[in-house]
Amino acid sequence: MAAKELHFNVDARAALKRGVDQLAEAVKVTLGPKGRNVVIDKKFGAPTVTKDGVTVAKEIELADPIENMGAQMVKEVATKTSDLAGDGTTTATVLAQAIFREGLKNVTAGSNPMALKRGIEKAVAGIVEELKRISVPTTGKKEIAQVGTISANNDPEIGNLIAEAMEKVGKDGVITVEEAKGLETTLETVDGMQFDRGYLSPYFVTDPEKMEAVLENALILIHDKKISAMKDLLPALEKVAQLGKPLLIIAEDVEGEALATLVVNKLRGTLRICAVKAPGFGDRRKAMLQDIATLTKGQVISDEVGFKLENAVLTDLGSAKRIVIDKDNTTIIDGAGEQKDIEGRVREIRGAIDKSTSDYDREKLQERLAKLAGGVAVINVGAATEAEMKEKKARVEDALHATRAAVEEGIVPGGGVALIRAQHVLKDVKVAERDEQIGVDIVRRAIEEPLRMIVQNAGGEGSIVVEKIRTAKETSFGYNALTDVYEDLVQAGVIDPTKVTRTALQNAASIAGLLLTTEALIVEKKEDKPAAPAGGPGMGGMY
């Protein structure tokens, strides 16, 4: 085992502070509408140009192992805030640096770190309650567009696209971000339920121009096993043929004699029919087939419950107004399912999401929920170059997270103003001793820091702006750094999701509290490697 190096008390905290400051200084230049760019060197390809705090933070590794510890702990603040709220990473970093810096001065002057930490926690709890009180629910498309615009570094095109997507698919809908082939950034929405399985044979196509099979007012047969023998399918097919309605067969697979017979009947015009494979795999496939059955008011014909395919009757089949199948996807529009059954199924999936511990499972459950409850929207991000594409895609993803957070917990005035507005509650925080009061005062000073930084990046003087806003009476009065005017920020569209501001403060205080109460550091000792031996003499005339 390699030898370790130990550092204690003042030395340890001073080294941590150097690391925290290096990371924070690189990140906080990006804060606000007039934040500066950071250029990150890449081993391959063009350098990345970004104004996204978490992207900058993730790239930072310091040479000194102790300083690097401090930097990594603050990086944790940025990434945790990004994961939970999707935005506010730079604000969280600025707050963590400010709380740690002010706290360190007091610890060095003899304050008890544990009492400071208790004071910081009490102050943060008070501010979080006040943020919830001044929070306003997001109701309209306009507010969602404003939140998206701010999170996408003041790009109204992205804000409007996200608002439109949310309006179309609802708050439970899935919105995905893809790279477009051209320069335009566009929005595509899919009504109804879509799954990624296409027709099993191109002979099923009804529209040769678009290479699509379109079935109007169709019945749907859902089976969880392979269909290869025609005799199993025949009874159901005869009943459907008598009705004269189109039929979609969804099964694990349709092959051999069964597929050939279906194709022949389709080509002769005896049946309007199409067959597709069931979506998903294993248990997820069973669940997705049950979702389709609920949506279309059908039954999953399954041997597992003693339900054989040859015994299927018309009432076991689902139905939908329109079904569109291309070579890759099947879309079921306007299924005949009862609303109460669909809502029951949605509640089941929501329960499973709450209990799920795996991110992957949760994502898949969320997709199923969207297909049942809302719909699916795809934002195709277009740009002129690869570097611009990456940067823009990251901004769209940030803005998407932030708008979801706004819908969840509401909005507060942006531009660092909400924290200043919540400052007054700190005078009522009950403390047990003087050092706890110092902890409360540390937070009082630290929550001004995001506003100071926004003003500083815009070329102004932070202290003057903070004082002017603190003495104003209106809750949403603040400084709009983009236009350089004082105005009602909510009306001007400068708003932040409450969840973003709350998460940034809580995460920053948590890590700063840990850093302040650190008394020892253990790092691996650097080994003094001996110089490499010089090369040996040449081998003479040997070949």
UniProtKB/Swiss-Prot annotation:
Q: What Enzyme Commission number(s) appear in the record?
A: 5.6.1.7
Cell compartment(s), UniProt: Cytoplasm
Q: Which NCBIfam families match?
A: GroEL, PRK00013.1, PRK12849.1, PRK12850.1, PRK12851.1
| Gene Ontology terms for molecular function | ATP binding; ATP-dependent protein folding chaperone; isomerase activity; unfolded protein binding
What this chain does, per the entry, is described as:
Together with its co-chaperonin GroES, plays an essential role in assisting protein folding. The GroEL-GroES system forms a nano-cage that allows encapsulation of the non-native substrate proteins and provides a physical environment optimized to promote and accelerate protein folding.
Q: Which reaction equations make up its catalytic activity? A: ATP + H2O + a folded polypeptide = ADP + phosphate + an unfolded polypeptide
Q: For binding ATP, which residues are annotated in this chain's numbering?
A: 30-33, 51, 87-91, 415, 480-482, 496
What CDD domains is this protein classified in?
GroEL (cd03344)
Q: What is the top EC class of this enzyme, as a single word?
A: isomerase
Record's protein name:
Chaperonin GroEL
Keyword terms of this UniProt record:
ATP-binding, Chaperone, Cytoplasm, Isomerase, Nucleotide-binding
Please classify the protein's predominant subcellular localization into one broad category: cytoplasm
In terms of domain of life, where is this protein from? Bacteria
**Oligomeric form and interacting partners:** Forms a cylinder of 14 subunits composed of two heptameric rings stacked back-to-back. Interacts with the co-chaperonin GroES.
Identify one Gene Ontology CC term for this UniProt entry: cytoplasm
GO-annotated biological processes: protein refolding
Concerning HAMAP family, the annotation shows: CH60
As for family, the record states:
Belongs to the chaperonin (HSP60) family.
